[in-house]
Amino acid sequence: MKHVIMLYFIAAATLFSSCAKQDSEHRLITVKNSLDLPRAFETIEISKSDIQLHTGERFEDFSIQDVATKAILTSQFVDEDQDGTADVLLFQPELNPNSEKQFELVKVDGGVEVDSTVYCYSRFVPERTDDYTWENNKVAFRTYGPVAQKMVEDSLPGGTLSSGIDAWLKKVEYSIIDNWYAKNDKDPGYYHIDHGEGLDNFHVGSSRGVGGSAVKVDTSYYISKNFTDYKTITTGPIRTSFILKYADWDANEKTISEEKHISLDYGNNFSRFEIHVDGTDELSVGLTLHDNKGEITQNVDQGWIAYWESEYFDSELGTAIVAPKGVMTASEYYVTSMKDRSNLYAQLNVDNNKVVYYAGFAWKESKQYPTKASWEKYIQEFSEKLNTPLEVSIQ
């Protein structure tokens, strides 16, 4: 039995050598790269339904082995429907340009050591009002919940009324979320100062931050309030994912219902946003312009917009939105006198009440993409890989 799967782009993999028990039935996975680019940090998803399990076999007992090298790859199981059993197995191969590799599902010995460090992490943060914050080894983000909203509406200090996406500018690979919040609790303002790991000096306010959504009616943009509920799906070495729910909101007498399914994979500077939305056939997603001094680069036909701030707190910062080809229909450099409401917007087609896009950033101090040119090269290659996904067959 053979399945062919076209997979969307995102994530990373580390190789480890080990001994594996060979099953009597080989389950081979072939991954093909048809681009003239090396491929890494892209997540392959193997669904439990793709594998014919025999009586007594458990999906969770399998690992991924490189057929040629016999190395065991880092992998992660995900219980997507939260029923207590894994639905998907994730791994991240590395492929040369125009090449293919074979992998096998194997049962490894109990003593095999595989890196299971939780680089991709997210959680609800009740101790800091009620943020939801997420990160991988490259970047971190957060957004704001109902308590923060109510504090503003009740004129209490410390609240935030925003559905924008905040950027936490980390410059270390390890997880910083818990540490930053703990130290900020003891020393208020701690994470607004760089102590060697990075900082949060990114102003969101009511802007869209890095990829927040809006609905445009005539010449005006309408936005939701804070998220009202959340569900964490997974954290691990390859992916974190979660769901944010929002109360219905008004866009010039149009009722908008919105739910955000967000994931962030290892090795990527972009979060993936899958928005489930009713009430509109077009969604606008934006990048804050801050003081409007940045440079815009875009290729709407290819599905991306970018903003580079060369005078960002004695450093430089780039943000971007990327969508699959054909989803982005236009962009708008929207400047207004309303505080925090100036954004670079991408207009995205909603198909069957759903739209997918990616939003992220690069900070010069992280040394990941320290120049405008290197950031735009990454965006262009990300877009190319997104539109030419790795081909995966299972037999």
Swiss-Prot record:
Q: Which UniProt key words apply to this protein?
A: Cell outer membrane, Lipoprotein, Membrane, Palmitate, Signal
Q: Where is the lipid attached (S-diacylglycerol cysteine)?
A: 19
Q: Where are the transmembrane segments?
A: none
Q: Superkingdom, according to UniProt?
A: Bacteria
A Pfam family the protein falls into? DUF4861
Per the record, lipidation of type N-palmitoyl cysteine is found at 19
- Leader sequence residues: 1-18
What kind of membrane protein is this, topologically?
Lipid-anchor
Main subcellular localisation? membrane
- The keyword Mitochondrion is assigned to this record: no
Cellular component per GO, a single term: cell outer membrane
Q: Where in the cell is it found?
A: Cell outer membrane
Please describe what this protein does: May be involved in ulvan degradation. Ulvan is the main polysaccharide component of the Ulvales (green seaweed) cell wall. It is composed of disaccharide building blocks comprising 3-sulfated rhamnose (Rha3S) linked to D-glucuronic acid (GlcA), L-iduronic acid (IduA), or D-xylose (Xyl).
* Name this polypeptide is given: Uncharacterized protein P7
Species per Swiss-Prot/TrEMBL record:
Formosa agariphila (strain DSM 15362 / KCTC 12365 / LMG 23005 / KMM 3901 / M-2Alg 35-1)
